[in-house]
Amino acid sequence: IKTLGFSDHSPYIFDGDYYSHFRMRPEEFEGYVQSLTALRDEYKKDIDIYIGVEAEYYPKYFARLCDFLSDYPLDYMIMGQHYLCNEYDGTSSCDVYTEEKDLERYVGQVIEGFSTGKFAYIAHPDIFRFQGDEKIYEKHMIRLCEAAKSLEIPLEINFLGIRASRHYPRKDFFRIAAEVGNNVIFGCDAHSPTELDYKKEFDCAMKEY
């Protein structure tokens, strides 16, 4: 490996005393950046290290997040839309949905996030667990894919989903992406160093998607 990017779940500064269960707290972020900056400097002759975050687009708080992150030397931000609305007032994208209104809300929020120009690509764009009518799914995912193509935002085939046998990546989603003509990237989504050996996932992605 000659290039390695780190993109932990970004802190979000919510109103009140709400904290996410799956992301670092704002007060931990400086240590995150400092540790990666030190590693980047120490190993600069051996490997290129990039410092980033994975973040949702939450309309109520996104400007606040960007203002917070602007104080740090980040190289990129990935969109990973794990929740609808603003998280604390929404539902998980991994819940099961059958109603069109929920899928429409997810896609609309993602496209709105695309339009900010802040995201390098979208991780697991097919994370939304819609199990309703396939024609409804296709209609709205065409919207998502066309918006991503227009704004030159790549779509990720997520290796963690393959590795952990999750409900994504979805073949029907990437069939739509192929028809629209999207740029696609592979994301190893490694949560430990051992998961950087992703040949099995790569081979699966090349065969299945």
PLM region spans:
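Short acidic/polar active-site loop segments enriched in Thr and Asp
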Residues: K2-T3, D75, A120
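Long, positively charged, glycine-interspersed low-complexity recognition regions
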Residues: F173-Y209
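An N-terminally biased module of ancient metal coordination in phosphate/nucleic-acid-related enzymes
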Residues: I1-A55, Q131-C145, E152, F159, ...
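Short low-complexity, flexible loop/linker segments enriched in glycine and/or proline
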Residues: Y18-F22, C66, R170-F173, K199-D203
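Generic structural signal for hydrophobic
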Residues: I1, L69, G113, A148, ...
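Domain-core and long-helix interface of multi-subunit machines
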Residues: I78-V180
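Hydrophobic alpha-helical segments and helix pairs
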Residues: D48-S92
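Helix C-cap/helix->beta junction micro-motif
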Residues: Y43-K45, Y72, S150-L151, V180
